[in-house]
Amino acid sequence: MLRGSASSTSMEKAKGKEWTSTEKSREEDQQASNQPNSIALPGTSAKRTKEKMSIKGSKVLCPKKKAEHTDNPRPQKKIPIPPLPSKLPPVNLIHRDILRAWCQQLKLSSKGQKLDAYKRLCAFAYPNQKDFPSTAKEAKIRKSLQKKLKVEKGETSLQSSETHPPEVALPPVGEPPALENSTALLEGVNTVVVTTSAPEALLASWARISARARTPEAVESPQEASGVRWCVVHGKSLPADTDGWVHLQFHAGQAWVPEKQEGRVSALFLLPASNFPPPHLEDNMLCPKCVHRNKVLIKSLQWE
């Protein structure tokens, strides 16, 4: 009985050892199967950390590159340095680099503000010149005053040119003006020729026409008594005995030619002359030839 019990216990021990060995082998297999995952995880994390470090490094390097670009700006053009003048110009007309170069030529300090260097240069090289601003504000004020003076000079020159009377060329004595058809009737009539530019002459002519067109026509003008009339387009006096003379009308900034039918007018397309009539002749009349020319011009401009 003892032997049987001993053999059974030994068999149980052997089975227990085998079971424990199989469990250990299973655990080892599981550990071996799990080990690559555990190894891969640190690898991936290491890669991620490396990528993060590289991104950070690139971010750090970018400002450095930008700083390098900003530290090396484009080379500026060198300003030519003129020699020292006999009289120093105002401080607002001198460039800072030129002033600095002049100070360096005379071995003067060019530090500080531009006005300080200008004062040092004046005191050293131009002791007799005292008309210079003492502050930057005074320099700005002087600059603005100079601009105002230039503008005022330009305005005064324009006003003088406008108010100055135009040059008048009178015909030579003994030579009457060229007249058509009748010379006996037009003796003693003087024509005044004004030398002006074409646009000014046209404006002056239109101004005269508009001023005369507003005057009443009932009063008999002296030109009818003298037997001559002044044609606006021809710019000279012509015989008044021919039929077809018309008084120009001026409405809405346009000169109009009255037609034979009452109440109808046509626009004046002919340009007036730049000659001024004598004082006793009316300046808003159109001769029959010019009336006909204006009608032909209107017909040619009409659409077919």
From Swiss-Prot:
Modified residues (Phosphothreonine): 215
GO biological process terms on file: lung-associated mesenchyme development; system development
Organism superkingdom: Eukaryota
Region feature (Disordered): 1-84, 147-176
Modified residues (Phosphoserine): 221, 226
Residue ranges with Basic and acidic residues bias: 12-29
InterPro entries per UniProt: Dppa2/4, Dppa2/4_C_dom, Dppa2/4_central_dom
Coiled coil, from the record: none
Subcellular location: Nucleus
GO function terms (MF aspect): chromatin binding
Bias (Polar residues): 1-11
Broad class of where this protein is predominantly found: nucleus
Keyword tags: Developmental protein, Nucleus, Phosphoprotein, Transcription, Transcription regulation
Membrane spanning residue stretches: none
Role noted for this protein: May be involved in the maintenance of active epigenetic status of target genes. May inhibit differentiation of embryonic cells into a primitive ectoderm lineage.
PANTHER family: DCR DOMAIN-CONTAINING PROTEIN (PTHR16073), DEVELOPMENTAL PLURIPOTENCY-ASSOCIATED PROTEIN 4 (PTHR16073:SF8)
Subunit structure: Interacts with DPPA2. Interacts with PCGF1.
Protein name as catalogued: Developmental pluripotency-associated protein 4
Organism listed in the record: Homo sapiens (Human)
Gene (name only): DPPA4
